């Protein structure tokens, strides 16, 4: 199995973790978080000085023999997915942005990725239930500790009530 953006099996969820651990298939990790669970994987691509796992994956894919730096050899869906992942992990370039992040965005746009369309799909197309959920969470579920930490709990009953979809 390939584990992307998941520095340890425990981050994969209680149902998936035992399956991943018991799998006899080679295990590959591609991640940008600190302290990956290296011993559980046969191959580890780990770099913390990148914006996202998508940025690290972009670097890996560009060096593959069938690509050799030529993004035109990749399907547009792949390029769009890489741009989408990098955009969401950086909160639209608001955090964890490095020079390589901007280079990646530039290369993807030069290869034909329509960043404006991706932004529109990510940030301007909400179902009514999603807006209602956001309002509910802010109004009824937002907790702020005395230290100033804010959090919300989105349990299964709330997910069901608002037809939550990822």
What is each residue range found by the language model?
Residues 83, 88-166:
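Hydrophobic helix-and-loop "lid/oligomerization" segment in the mid-to-C-terminal part
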Residues 28-33, 55-58, 113-114, 136, ...:
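Short, surface-exposed, polar/charged, turn-prone segments marking secondary-structure boundaries
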Residues 32-106:
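Short alpha-helices
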Residues 14-15, 70, 118, 131:
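A generic "cationic amphipathic patch" detector
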Residues 1-13, 50-58, 84-88, 114-127:
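Short charge-dense sequence patches
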Residues 1-43:
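Active-site cofactor/cluster-binding pocket
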